[in-house]
Amino acid sequence: VRKSDDTKVMTALLVSEAIDRGELSQDQMITVSSTSQFDLSADGSTANLKPGEVISVKDLMYCLLLPSANEAANILAEAVCGDVASFIELMNQRARELGCTGTHFANTHGLHDDDHYTTAYDICLFSREALKHDLIREVVGTSVYTVPATNLSEPREFYNTNALLSNWHYMGYVYDKAIGVKTGTTPEAGRCLVSAAVDGDEYLIAVILGAEPAVREDGSTDLKQFSESTALLKWGFRNFQRTTISQEDTPVAAVNVTLSQDANQVLVKPVGTLERTLPVDMDLEAIEPTISLFQDTVEAPVKEGQVMGTMTLTYDGEVFGTLDLVATTSVDRSELLYRQEQIRQFFANSGTKLILAAVLVVAVLVLLRLLVFRKRRRYRAGAGAGGRRGSYH
């Protein structure tokens, strides 16, 4: 499908990641360039930022995500990469890293381009990543924000275009669990909304693309991008729940242990927990653990908490996650058994056997040489004695 202003969520993500890397700061002042106005339509959404205007990165993020200013997307792109083209390359690279296989960016703001497209699933992926950043959550969850006066403008007041958060643009759609994220409308993409909501520890994202207004029975207009998003989120909270699918302190396998007089095996357990949002009626017994031990047998000593393998949890072919398996107790080494094993290994070593064989051969040769030498000495001694006796006659 064609992208619209949901593109700006990816733009905001890359800006936030640049801040995390220390390449930018929220308070850093940016001077608006003339090139930031490139490729913008005259009737597109704007914050009326002018070339030469000086404004902070944080205020630009509000301009980007509340009034959906197209020029703010280009200004921030230049702040991160120096030029818009390099930033677009970074957008596509990040999309691939996040697993967005059906997405290609051709600009920073979402205005129509034949080479600019995505899927609802991909939008969910990069929106989920964006919402991990405090600054983005703060901005998209704000109903109204005042950008302070700049060198070229009086203060600007902007209202969130997301009717799930604010009645300013459209009445009757506020949803008390909503926390964002971004509206978007172009003639080609239709009316779109990426929304997110939180209920307790459960967090859901809904994506509506290409919605068209409908007329209610009373003649009023139903903006489906908002009403259907709320319906989806409420359905999600009714039918899904945050579930812990692996408990710590439950041994799941044993590893054999040698060189110890205290124990001949040690139990292993998963460390940490895996939590997923799962259907409320899902049979957790159907989740399959796959145990992978580094070794079936290890030598003592073993330390409590020592990583001995991994456990992967899978349901219907989907991998939920992997946990380390650690030893539940320590197992001390027997020094007697250890020394005996060293001696056994010494004599079992093929190199040692060759050396011992060579030593044995040398010893046999030396012994034979000694025997021959002694035999010759006796012979010479006997011959000498016989000669002396004959000389007296």
Each predicted region: which residue ranges?
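Domain-terminus/edge residues, biased toward the C-terminal soluble/receptor-binding domains
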Residues: C100-H104, D114-Y117, Y121-G382, Y392
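Active-site-adjacent loops and short helices of periplasmic peptidoglycan-processing enzymes
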Residues: V1-D134, V139
